[in-house]
From Swiss-Prot:
Residues binding Ni(2+) 2, per UniProt: K219, H248, H274
EC number(s) given by UniProt: 3.5.1.5
Protein name stated in the entry: Urease subunit alpha
Species the sequence originates in: Thermosynechococcus vestitus (strain NIES-2133 / IAM M-273 / BP-1)
GO biological process terms on file: urea catabolic process
Length: 572
C-alpha cells in the first residue's frame, strides 16, 4: 500500500522535487526543478534507519562488478543544460551516471549501483554545480589557489611566475625555462592548471618554443606591445598548434584602433579579456569586440556588477597593477581613459543579453580570485532587479529564473572550458567528465560551498573544530581535505598542456606527477559554440559621451547601492 506524503515533508526528507522552487542565497533569483530522475517511494538516503543499508538501498555488488565509488543522493543539479533533481554516481574520478541510485535487486530503474564499496554524500536540499573555471589568472602568489578552490574554482588558466613586475601586470609565463618551473610547481596544488606563454612577438620562433614547452595558449598584452604585427604572428602560431590566444589590447591606440586590431585577427578565433575595457583595451570602444563572431569575449570581476563604488576603486587598482606613477600626468591620464561608467553599465546589460560569454577574475591584477562566482550571481541579481524577468526562448511562458541562472552559470563553467579546449574533460555536470563538483546549501549558494569535490574526492569543505566530538562545532570555515594532500592531490587534479608539449615528452622530462591532458579543438571555435551566451550585437560607442548602443538600443543602467552575497555572509 502506497503512502502519501505532503510536499513540504517530502522536500525536508528527500529534497525538493519537480515544481518546487529554490531561492539562490539572498538574491532575487528563483529556480524551479524541471525533472526528477529519482523514483518516488524508492529514493535512497543514508543514515540510521534510512535506505542505504545492506539488502535495502545497498546491493552486494562489488565495485569491479559495477557499483560506483561515490554517490551523491537527491541533489538539485544547476548547469547550463538544465535544473534537475538526481542522484549522481562517481567512478574512477569521473561522473559515471546522472539518474537513479540504489540496489537493482530490490528497486526498479536503478542505473547507479550502490554497493559495499560505495561512499555516500548527502545531496538532499543541496545544489550541485560544476567546479568553476577561472581563465584569467595572474599567478602572482600560490596562496591564490587555496582562496580560489575554497570559493568553488577547480580549474585555473593564466600566466605568471610569482610577484614579478611582469606577472603583476600580464598573465604570461614567458619562455621555456619559466614554463618548466611553473609546470613543476603545478604538482603541488589540488586544482587543474594550465599556463599561458607570452604572445607578443613579430617573429614566430620565440612563440613556437613556448608552445613546444607546454603552454596551453599564448597571451598578447599591451604592456608587452599588442601591435597588429604581434597579433598576426601570435594567431598564426596558434593556428599551427591548435591553442588559444588571449588578448589585452592597446588602450592608448598607439599602434592602431579597435578596427585595426579586428583586421589583424583576420577572422581567427581569439579570447578577448575584459572586453569592456576597464581592465585594459582600446579606449573607449574595445567593447565592440563582443559583436565579432570570431571573438570569445569575457569580463573580469572588478567591474561585476556596476555599483556606486566601482569607479573609485578602479583608479587606484590600475595604478598599482600596471606600474604607473600617480605623479606623472600621462600615467594618470592613461588610467582615467580606461575607467568609464557608461561602458561598465553597458557591460551589465550585455551579460544579461548573452553578448558577454565568460566571467573570470584577473587575480590580484585588478581582480579578486575568490569572487568570480559571487560577482557572477550579483550581476544576475542586479539585472533581474533592473530589467525584470528574462524570457526563456524555449519556454516563453515560465516565470522562474532557470534560463537566467543557466546563462550565468555557463559564464564560469562550460564557456571558459570550451574557449580553452578543455570542455572534453571539465566545465559541466555531464557523464564522462572529471568529477569536479561543488555542493552548496541554497542559503549560501555562490558564496560558500559546503563541499568542493575534486576528481571524485572531497578537496575542500566547511569544517568545524577538529578537536570537537562532531564535525559541526564552530568556528566552521573552509578547510583543505584529503584530495589536497599527498598522492591524492596529483591523482585527482590534472595539468593541461599543448599537444606539442606532450609530443615533446615534456611531462616525462620534468617528472610531472599529475596526469597531463592536451587542449584541442580550439581553432575552429566561434562565439556560436558558447552555451547560452552567443548574441552578436552591432555595438556603437559615442567617442565623446561613451554611450553604448547595441543594435541601435542605448544600453544604460543605474549603479547598485546594495548587493546580495555580500557583507551579511562575511560577518565571521
Amino acid at each position: 500500500m502506497s503512502y502519501r506524503i505532503d510536499r513540504q515533508t517530502y522536500a525536508e526528507t528527500y529534497g525538493p522535487t519537480v515544481g518546487d522552487r529554490l531561492r539562490l542565497a539572498d538574491t532575487d533569483l528563483i529556480i524551479e526543478i524541471e525533472h526528477d530522475y529519482t523514483h518516488y517511494g524508492d529514493e535512497v538516503k543514508f543514515g540510521g534507519g534510512k535506505v542505504i543499508r545492506d539488502g535495502m538501498g545497498q546491493s552486494p555488488i562489488a565495485n569491479a562488478e559495477g557499483a560506483v565509488d561515490v554517490v551523491i543522493t537527491n541533489a538539485v543539479i544547476l548547469d547550463w543544460w538544465g535544473v534537475v533533481k538526481a542522484d549522481v554516481g562517481i567512478k574512477d574520478g569521473k561522473i559515471y551516471k546522472i539518474g537513479k541510485a540504489g540496489n537493482p535487486y530490490t528497486q526498479e530503474g536503478v542505473d547507479i549501483i550502490i554497493g559495499p564499496g560505495t561512499e555516500a554524500i548527502a545531496g538532499e536540499g543541496m545544489i550541485l554545480t560544476a567546479g568553476g573555471i577561472d581563465a584569467h589568472i595572474h599567478f602572482i602568489c600560490p596562496q591564490q589557489i587555496a582562496t580560489a578552490i575554497a570559493a568553488g574554482i577547480t580549474t585555473m588558466i593564466g600566466g605568471g611566475t610569482g610577484p614579478a613586475t611582469g606577472t603583476n601586470a600580464t598573465t604570461c609565463t614567458p619562455g621555456p625555462w619559466n614554463i618548466y618551473r611553473m609546470l613543476q610547481a603545478a604538482d603541488a596544488f589540488p586544482v587543474n592548471l594550465g599556463f599561458l606563454g607570452k604572445g607578443n612577438s613579430s617573429q614566430p620562433q620565440g612563440l613556437i618554443e613556448q608552445v613546444q614547452a607546454g603552454v596551453v595558449g599564448l597571451k598578447l598584452h599591451e604592456d608587452w606591445g599588442s601591435t597588429p604585427n604581434a597579433i598576426d604572428t601570435c594567431l598564426s602560431v596558434a593556428e599551427d598548434y591548435d591553442i588559444q590566444v588571449a588578448i589585452h589590447t592597446d588602450t592608448l591606440n598607439e599602434s592602431g584602433f579597435v578596427e585595426d586590431t579586428i583586421a589583424a585577427f583576420k577572422n581567427r578565433t581569439i579570447h578577448a579579456y575584459h572586453t569592456e575595457g576597464a581592465g585594459g583595451g582600446h579606449a573607449p570602444d574595445i567593447i565592440k569586440l563582443c559583436g565579432q563572431a570570431n571573438v570569445l569575449p569575457s569580463s573580469t570581476n572588478p567591474t561585476r556588477p556596476y555599483t556606486v563604488n566601482t569607479l573609485d576603486e578602479h583608479l587606484d587598482m590600475l595604478m598599482v597593477c600596471h606600474h604607473l606613477d600617480p605623479s606623472i600626468p600621462e600615467d594618470v591620464a592613461f588610467a582615467e581613459s580606461r575607467i568609464r561608467r557608461e561602458t561598465i553599465a553597458a557591460e551589465d546589460i550585455l551579460h544579461d543579453l548573452g553578448a558577454f560569454s565568460i566571467i573570470s577574475s584577473d587575480s590580484q591584477a585588478m581582480g579578486r580570485v575568490g569572487e568570480s562566482i559571487i560577482r557572477t550571481w550579483q550581476t544576475a541579481h542586479k539585472m533581474k532587479v533592473q530589467r525584470g524577468h528574462l524570457r526563456d526562448p524555449q519556454r516563453p511562458g515560465v516565470d522562474h529564473d532557470n534560463f537566467r541562472a543557466r546563462r550565468y552559470v555557463a559564464k564560469y563553467t562550460i564557456n571558459p572550458a570550451i574557449t580553452h579546449g578543455i570542455a572534453e574533460y571539465v566545465g559541466s555536470v555531464e557523464v564522462g567528465k572529471i568529477a569536479d563538483l561543488c555542493l552548496w546549501k541554497p542559503a549560501f549558494f555562490g558564496v560558500k560551498p559546503e563541499l568542493v569535490i575534486k576528481g571524485g574526492v572531497i578537496a575542500y569543505a566547511q569544517m568545524g573544530d577538529a578537536n570537537a566530538s562532531i564535525p559541526t562545532p564552530q568556528p566552521v570555515h573552509m578547510q583543505p581535505m584529503f584530495a589536497s594532500y599527498g598522492g591524492c592531490r596529483t591523482t585527482t587534479s590534472v595539468t593541461f598542456m599543448s599537444q606539442a608539449g606532450i609530443a615533446n615528452n615534456i611531462p616525462e622530462q620534468l617528472g610531472l606527477q599529475k596526469t597531463v591532458l592536451p587542449v584541442g579543438h580550439i581553432r575552429q571555435l566561434r562565439k556560436a559554440d558558447l552555451k547560452l551566451n552567443d548574441y552578436l550585437p552591432h555595438i556603437e560607442v559615442d567617442p565623446e559621451t561613451y554611450e553604448v548602443r547595441a543594435d541601435g538600443e542605448l544600453l544604460t543602467c543605474e549603479p547598485a547601492t546594495v548587493l546580495p552575497l555580500a557583507q551579511r555572509y562575511f560577518l565571521f
